[in-house]
């Protein structure tokens, strides 16, 4: 298992320093997300400033960009980083596609699968000089003259991860992708009984095995130096869990544990804007299954014990103010990595 770091400072003026520090502390990958900022720009800044740490998107929203645009961006970052990019893509939900990005939302699973295949076809054209002939249900690409072709690079095999919650996405990830970004709203039971079987089905269809595939996620952790601090941070985690559990997309996680009844109740309260009451509906059992609690001296070992064999790359999800020293971070990396 490898401990990664989710970027929390998106000011491009400080990205290089942040990335170098993450690399020096031993983190395996620096992940960006597409929430308030572009996910690719920080990686372009971090690439020439570092030499070992991997650089990834967790995730970039796939459909607002043409696969051609994504292909160019990923190709350039892969070249600048000497092969350290992990391209993470996700479909997002209907509301964000249609109302935040103003793009059509249709058949998200098959369409995301086609994005992956289109990217590979475009990159093969650039790397090998083969004609670009991609024809799918949603995308078609057949024009690539030398003037627009960036040409081959030293590390052309860019790993693609997709975000998945439901069975189709997990199976599709196993069939055509290199890894799966598991949503932070997860449990070990959900991973073991729902996610892994679906991915394995896809891997078998592609003729590959588990060793060819990577599971990555951010894990909710409740960390504090004393009981009072941990209790306050636990409440912040409850609130975030309630937010995710109110979204119907994540129903498979609830169903795995027999918690289906709480989903509609949370959704109703979210429509009413009753956020405080939502957190109170998250039971201690749910909190214990979804989050890992402890101190920085033992949380890494607890993560490793719970998710050994289920996850390959993890980062900490802490929706509260974090105070951690460089020494604690370096030790945490060793705990998770088994050092």
Regions found by a protein language model. Give the residues of each.
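Active-site-adjacent structural elements that line small-molecule/cofactor binding pockets in enzymes
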Residues: 1-339
């Amino acid at each position: 298992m490898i401990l990664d770091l989710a970027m929390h400072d998106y000011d491009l003026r400080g990205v290089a320093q942040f990335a170098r520090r993450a690399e020096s502390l031993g983190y395996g990958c620096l992940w960006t997300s597409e929430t308030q900022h572009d996910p690719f720009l920080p990686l372009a800044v971090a690439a020439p400033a570092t030499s070992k740490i991997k650089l990834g998107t967790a995730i970039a929203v796939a459909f607002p960009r043409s696969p051609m645009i994504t292909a160019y961006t990923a190709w350039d970052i892969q070249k600048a980083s000497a092969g350290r990019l992990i391209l993470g893509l996700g479909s997002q939900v209907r509301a964000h596609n249609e109302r935040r990005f103003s793009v059509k939302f249709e058949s998200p699973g098959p369409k995301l699968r086609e994005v992956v295949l289109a990217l590979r076809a475009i990159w093969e054209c650039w790397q090998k000089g083969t004609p670009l002939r991609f024809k799918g249900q949603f995308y078609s690409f057949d024009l690539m003259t030398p003037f627009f072709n960036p040409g081959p690079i030293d590390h052309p095999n860019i790993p693609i991860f997709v975000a998945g919650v439901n069975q189709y996405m997990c199976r599709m990830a196993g069939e055509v992708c290199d890894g799966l970004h598991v949503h932070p709203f997860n449990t070990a039971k959900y991973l073991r009984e729902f996610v892994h079987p679906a991915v394995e089905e896809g891997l078998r269809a592609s003729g590959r095995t588990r060793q060819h595939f990577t599971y990555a996620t951010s894990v909710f952790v409740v960390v504090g130096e004393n009981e009072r601090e941990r209790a306050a941070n636990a409440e912040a985690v409850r609130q975030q869990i309630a937010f995710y559990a109110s979204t119907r997309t994540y129903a498979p996680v609830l169903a795995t544990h027999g918690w289906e009844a709480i989903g509609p109740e949370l959704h109703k309260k979210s429509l009413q804007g009753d956020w405080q009451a939502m957190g109170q509906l998250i039971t201690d059992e749910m909190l214990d299954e979804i989050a890992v609690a402890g101190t920085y001296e033992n949380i890494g070992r607890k993560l490793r014990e719970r998710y050994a064999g289920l996850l390959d790359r993890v980062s900490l999800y802490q929706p509260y103010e974090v105070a951690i020293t460089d020494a604690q971070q370096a030790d945490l990396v060793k705990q998770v990595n088994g050092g």
